[in-house]
A protein has these predicted regions:
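Conserved long hydrophobic alpha-helices within structured protein cores
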Residues: 1-7, 29-39, 145-159
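Pocket-edge positions in alpha/beta enzyme catalytic cores
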Residues: 14-17, 51-55, 87, 91, ...
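Conserved beta-strand positions in the central sheet of alpha/beta enzyme cores
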Residues: 38, 76, 115, 154, ...
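Active-site acidic/histidine proton-transfer and metal-coordination neighborhood
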Residues: 58-62, 68-73, 83-192, 202, ...
Length: 306
C-alpha cells in the first residue's frame, strides 16, 4: 500500500485563478515524500491542465516522462465528472470530449485505475432501476475503451446533494450496496470501486461494514475528512471520520491499492510560502494512516491526564 495524493494538493491558489503547474506540483509532492500521485484530470477545464490543448498528447508525454524520472508512479487518475444522466446538461459537450482523452492519457502514463462518478437519473423511482440501467449503458463503452489502453475504471461512491435532479431517497450509488450492485452488473475484470471516505461520512455509513462488503471490488480510495455536513476535503483528524476504527479493515480485506489523499482545501487557501510545509505535514499524517491501515498501531497514549 503506497501513500498517494491527488495532484490538486498543490494546484489552486486562493483566488482560484492562479495555480501551480502540474509538472511543478509533481516535483514538490515527490520532494515532501509522497510515494505516488493521482492525476486529477477532472481539472481538464483549467489552464494548468492542458488536456484541452491541440498538443495534449505531447504534454501528457512530458507528465509520463516526469513520473518515471521522479520514480513517482501515477497509480490512479480522476476523470472529469458531471451528472451524465441529467438531460441536456450544459457540461456534457465539453466533458464527453475530455473523458476519452482522460482515458487515453491514463493509458499513456500506465495508470491502472481511472476514477469516474456514476450519474443519477432525474425522478428515479426508489428501486433505482433506471439509474442502474443508464449507468450500465454509459459506462460500458468507456470500460471497453479503458481496456484498450490497459486501464480499469473505479466507480466512486457519491453522497446526497451531488445532483441537481435528485431521485427520491437521494443520489444513486451513495451507498456501498448500490455501488456493489452496479459494479457486479458489468461482468468484466477492469471495473471496481473507488471508496471516498468523506462521502461515506456525509451519508453516515458504517464504513467498517461497507469495506467488508466491498472486499476485492475495492481498487482505489479518496482519503479526506469532513464534519459530516459538507464535503470539506480536509486533512484527516480535522473532521470527525473515525480513521482509527475504519482503516485497519483495509488490511483485513486484503486491499491492494493505495491510500490517496483528496484534500485540496488543506492547501488551496494558504499563501505560497506555506504550501510545501503543509504538504509535508499531510505526508506525515499519511504515514500514520498507513500504519493504521496496516494494523500497526496499538495501545496509543495521548499525552498527560489530569
Amino acid at each position: 500500500m503506497k501513500l498517494s495524493t491527488s495532484t490538486n494538493l498543490i494546484a489552486f491558489r486562493p483566488d482560484y485563478v492562479s495555480y501551480f503547474p502540474i509538472l511543478d506540483s509533481m516535483k514538490r509532492l515527490k520532494a515532501v515524500g509522497f510515494d505516488a500521485v493521482d492525476l486529477n484530470v477532472s481539472d481538464a477545464g483549467q489552464p494548468f491542465f492542458r488536456l484541452g490543448d491541440d498538443n495534449w498528447k505531447e504534454w501528457m508525454q512530458e507528465v509520463a516522462a516526469l513520473s518515471q524520472e521522479l520514480s513517482l508512479p501515477i497509480t490512479q487518475s480522476h476523470a472529469p465528472f458531471y451528472n451524465a444522466l441529467e438531460p441536456e446538461s450544459k457540461k456534457a459537450s465539453l466533458w464527453e470530449q475530455m473523458i476519452p482523452r482522460a482515458i487515453e492519457a491514463s493509458g499513456m502514463a500506465k495508470v491502472p485505475w481511472i476514477v469516474m462518478h456514476p450519474g443519477t437519473y432525474p425522478d428515479d423511482a426508489p428501486d433505482f432501476r433506471e439509474s442502474k440501467r443508464r449507468n450500465y449503458e454509459y459506462f460500458m463503452p468507456y470500460l471497453e475503451l479503458a481496456d484498450r489502453f490497459g486501464c480499469g475504471i473505479a466507480i466512486e461512491n457519491m453522497a446526497d446533494g451531488f445532483s441537481t435532479h435528485r431521485r427520491p431517497g437521494g443520489v444513486y450509488c451513495s451507498t456501498h450496496v448500490e455501488l456493489c450492485d452496479l459494479v457486479d452488473s458489468f461482468h468484466v475484470s477492469n471495473v471496481g470501486i473507488c471508496w471516498d471516505f468523506g462521502h461515506a461520512n456525509l451519508m453516515g455509513i458504517d464504513q467498517r461494514e461497507a469495506l467488508r462488503v466491498m472486499g476485492k471490488r475495492l481498487k482505489a480510495t479518496h482519503v479526506a475528512d469532513n464534519s459530516g455536513k459538507l464535503d470539506d476535503h480536509i486533512l484527516p483528524f480535522q473532521g470527525n471520520v473515525n480513521w482509527r476504527s475504519i482503516l485497519p479493515v483495509l488490511s483485513e480485506i486484503g486491499y491492494e491499492g493505495d491510500l490517496t489523499f483528496e484534500i485540496h482545501n488543506s492547501t488551496s487557501r494558504l499563501p505560497d510560502h506555506l504550501v510545501d510545509a503543509t504538504a509535508a505535514l499531510c505526508e506525515q499524517v499519511g504515514r500514520y494512516l498507513l500504519d493504521l491501515a496496516n494494523d500497526k498501531v496499538h495501545n496509543e497514549t495521548y499525552g498527560h491526564t489530569c
